[in-house]
């Protein structure tokens, strides 16, 4: 029998994650492990190796069903892991419950199956991952009956697919929807709004529409950081960035129509972009019509709507000049999973500092700018500033003072007039 340390629950979960969510360049895959696995020690006297924590990162506390699965993610799984070949056009939401050897040498396989079954009320597929040697025929029969996939982990950390689940159609709750958001082209997981001026993103569909080569057009007229502009344009849903090359979305096409209506040609529109190079003035003030278009584009970005809605609610509750710390504390109460994914870096160190093993917020850590996710507190905030939504631009994490960094709406509304 494998030792408790070699097939403890974190070891089992890390092996299962490598099988379900291998490290690839897939753009529509993302997974988080529960915050309990960010602890230094799992079994008494047996620390979790750093490499295992690194494999399990990032960490978050995501509620699915009546509890918090050990691992939750989104990915198109291969046919060997499912009882059907595919699941429509969207990758399924997957929940995993792991069980390993305890300090007494036992494995509660049945509990893992039942916990995974509970996640099926909101996930599309659920698995339990357990040491293969601990699985009985009755365990497998129960998993089949409850439509729970079963992954058997061997002493050499290979994976045996013992039972495959059928995909079920569930509407994901708000917390699970955050994981879907991170797995989409608009998620901020391991990517970046690399540029902090919206003109660089608005120009990308224009460059595609131009007869000349896209990268050359963008570099000549707008910005030389072509890859960063392309990534940001995809985040804002202006383009669909596929391996075969980017194409213009419906929203991006509207940007092109807007430019043609005002300038009659793409070349004429791009010549105006040259005048804005190096400008630090608010885009909304320098070019009001483009500022309004930016506002429309950035409002379609899911994170914007939630941030603005919660800032408005904070204003109504008397928090009229919220700091970054105030905002993150507030958001974590109402949208905990979203808050961590959007505002906190995905590294093991940052998540471990900000969240305890139960997923509760360690507020003291929020006063250190280094724990924050730059694409949100710097680039996204700058875009919201240029669009006329926020009063101040963002700052890079190493220059950030979270206590004095304000997130004020430009035009907060009076609540009684909305009723």
Predicted regions mapped to residue ranges:
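Nucleic-acid nuclease catalytic cores
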Residues: 104-112, 118-157
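Donor-sugar nucleotide-binding helix/loop cap in glycosyltransferases
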Residues: 173-419
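Conserved protein-kinase N-lobe ATP-binding Lys motif
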Residues: 100-102
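Mixed-charge intrinsically disordered linker/loop segments at interdomain junctions
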Residues: 144-191
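Conserved beta3 VAIK motif of the Hanks protein kinase fold
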Residues: 96
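Short amphipathic alpha-helical segments and helix-helix/interface helices
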Residues: 116, 139-140, 230, 381
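A short, highly charged nucleic-acid-interacting micro-segment common to nuclease
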Residues: 1-14, 368-373
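Active-site metal-binding core of divalent-cation-utilizing nuclease and nuclease-like domains
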Residues: 4-9, 17, 21-92, 108
């Amino acid at each position: 029998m494998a030792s408790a340390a070699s097939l403890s629950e974190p070891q089992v979960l890390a092996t299962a994650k490598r099988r379900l969510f291998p490290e690839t360049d897939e753009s529509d895959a993302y997974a988080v492990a529960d915050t309990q696995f960010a602890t230094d020690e799992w079994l008494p006297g047996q620390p979790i190796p750093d490499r295992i924590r690194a494999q399990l990162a990032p960490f978050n506390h995501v509620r699915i069903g009546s509890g918090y699965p050990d691992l939750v993610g989104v990915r198109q799984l291969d046919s060997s892991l499912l009882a059907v070949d595919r699941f429509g056009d969207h990758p399924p939401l997957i929940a995993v419950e792991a069980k390993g050897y305890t300090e007494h040498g036992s494995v509660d396989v049945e509990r893992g199956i039942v916990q995974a079954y509970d996640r099926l009320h909101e996930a599309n597929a659920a698995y339990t991952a357990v040491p293969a040697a601990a699985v009985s025929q009755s365990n497998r029969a129960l998993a089949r009956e409850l439509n729970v996939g079963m992954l058997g982990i061997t002493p050499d950390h290979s994976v045996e697919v013992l039972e495959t689940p059928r995909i079920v159609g569930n509407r994901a709750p708000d917390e699970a929807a955050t994981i879907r958001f991170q797995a989409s082209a608009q998620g901020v997981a391991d990517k970046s709004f690399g540029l902090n001026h919206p003109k660089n993103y608005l120009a990308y569909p224009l460059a595609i529409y131009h007869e000349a080569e896209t990268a050359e057009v963008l570099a000549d007229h707008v910005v030389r950081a072509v890859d960063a502009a392309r990534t940001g344009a995809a985040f804002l849903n202006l383009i669909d960035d596929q391996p075969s090359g980017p194409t213009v979305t419906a929203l991006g096409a509207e940007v092109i129509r807007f430019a043609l209506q005002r300038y009659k040609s793409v070349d004429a529109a791009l010549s105006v972009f040259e005048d804005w190079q190096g400008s630090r003035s608010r885009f909304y003030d320098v070019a009001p019509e483009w500022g309004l278009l930016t506002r429309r584009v950035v409002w379609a970005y899911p994170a914007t709507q939630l941030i603005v809605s919660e800032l408005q609610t904070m204003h109504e509750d008397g928090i009229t000049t919220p700091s970054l710390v105030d905002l993150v504390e507030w958001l974590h109460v109402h949208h905990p999973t979203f808050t961590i994914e959007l505002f906190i870096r995905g590294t093991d160190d940052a998540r471990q500092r900000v969240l305890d093993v139960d997923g509760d917020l360690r507020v003291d850590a929020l006063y250190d700018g280094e724990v924050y996710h730059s694409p949100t507190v710097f680039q996204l905030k700058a875009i919201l500033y240029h669009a006329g939504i926020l009063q101040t631009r963002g700052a890079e994490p190493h220059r950030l003072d979270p206590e004095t960094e304000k997130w004020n709406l430009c035009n907060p509304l009076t609540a009684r007039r909305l009723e």
